[in-house]
Curated annotation (Swiss-Prot):
The keyword Nucleotide-binding does not apply. The chain crosses the membrane at residues 51-71, 117-137, 235-255, 269-289, 301-321, 334-354. GO terms for cellular component: membrane. Its main location: membrane. Residues 1-30 are annotated as: Disordered. Keywords: Membrane, Transmembrane, Transmembrane helix. Belongs to the TMEM229 family. The lineage of its organism: Eukaryota, Metazoa, Chordata, Craniata, Vertebrata. This is Transmembrane protein 229A. It is found in: Membrane. It is a multi-pass membrane protein. It comes from Mus musculus.
Length: 371
């Protein structure tokens, strides 16, 4: 249930209004007409490009961890019928997923050069995917000596190869095809300011473009962002980020807190829905408290933390009644019914602040479908 607040700049006003000598009123009306509503990415394609490489690597690592958790959770449930739906991955695998996904992306972008789309989609790309994943898995096992909890799969058999082939088809035909439609604005703020008319005409243009102000403008007068990813995609992002948070936390807690030489962290399939829904609501709180009320970071964070604890307790209580709760803090001090503990308060504070940063970034990302 992550949350981060960084003062960031919203989109800059468009410079579509041209100056007419001696026609201040005409300039005002022309500027207002040119900036009626926030532009979508489809309406302003020149201002947006592909996601930066660092952002794609971040997404790829998070997406890879999600697949690890889904596969290991399904395997474990098939063996034990455990309703906790525990899944496993590790920071090492996150790094490998980032690198292998990035390499596969470069191969995917060469698809137009292949004379046969069928050959590329069902043979060439899946073969590269299976080969890279197998090589990465073998390298991880050799470096760590194998991992507990199913983080590192055994040697590939026929069923494993079939699963990897299906994942390769999903990766090429579903994930990358849509992920590469995401767009991010290029930084033109400084260039735009340098080319705006000076004095009163520039002020008029800034006022006319004020409807597009987003994070970073005057507090209390800003509009809540209306751009960004659709709500469903935001929910999916927050759910996957919840997996990332828990895998990293449990991994480092096992290694540092207990002195255990663990090579994996764990989470639960239910955490996807718990984190996704909680972060989705916290983001709405951020937009309301920051843009409508003008509240600063440390005035908002206590509200976030109270909501997070209430959300964790409610989910834990419901899952415990079904025998599906994957955590128990009864052995920790400052716990309540073993479902929440103040020991994790520093972590929730950090994640609460971090989510505002994530929200500011997601507000700039646009999904632009291609024909």
């Amino acid at each position: 249930m992550a949350g981060s607040d960084v003062a960031s700049e919203g989109p800059s006003p468009r410079d579509g209004a041209t100056r007419r000598p001696g026609a201040t009123g005409g300039l005002r009306s022309q500027a207002a007409a040119s900036c009626p509503e926030p532009l979508s990415a489809a309406e302003a394609p020149a201002e947006r490009g592909a996601l930066p490489a660092w952002m794609r690597l971040y997404f790829y690592g998070m997406h890879g961890i999600t697949l690890d958790v889904l596969v290991s959770s399904a395997r474990r449930f098939a063996r034990s019928l455990d309703l906790r739906m525990l899944g496993f991955s590790s920071p090492y695998r996150c790094l490998l997923h980032s690198l292998t996904h990035f390499a596969l992306e470069q191969l995917y972008l060469q698809r137009p050069r292949c004379p046969s789309a069928f050959l590329f989609n069902f043979l060439l790309y899946p073969s590269a995917h299976v080969g890279l994943q197998t090589l990465a898995g073998q390298a991880l096992r050799l470096s760590l000596g194998g991992g507990p909890g199913g983080a590192a799969a055994p040697a590939l058999g026929a069923l494993d190869l079939a699963l990897q082939y299906v994942l390769a088809l999903y990766h090429g035909q579903v994930f990358l095809k849509r992920f590469l439609c995401l767009r991010y604005p290029r930084r033109r703020d400084q260039h735009t300011r340098d080319t705006l008319p000076a004095a009163r005409d520039a002020q008029i243009l800034w006022e006319a473009g004020g409807q597009r102000r987003g994070p970073g403008g005057a507090r209390g007068t800003e509009r809540s962002p209306t751009q960004g990813l659709p709500d469903l995609l935001r929910f999916l992002f927050f759910g996957m980020h919840g997996f990332l948070d828990e895998i990293f936390f449990t991994f480092f807690f096992n290694v540092l807190g207990q002195g255990d030489r663990a090579s994996s962290g764990h989470t639960s399939l239910w955490s996807f829905f718990m984190y996704g829904s909680c972060s989705f609501v916290v983001e709405k709180l951020y937009f309301h408290l920051h843009y409508s009320r003008g509240w600063g970071t440390w005035k908002r964070v206590p509200i976030y933390v109270i909501f997070i604890y209430a959300w964790e307790f409610s989910w834990g209580l419901g899952l415990r009644m079904c025998g599906a709760c994957s955590w128990d803090y009864s052995h920790y001090p400052l716990n309540f019914m073993g479902l929440i503990t103040l020991m994790y308060l520093p972590g929730w504070l950090f994640l609460s602040v971090y989510q505002d940063l994530l929200s500011n970034v997601l507000w700039r990302v646009q999904y632009v479908p291609t024909n």
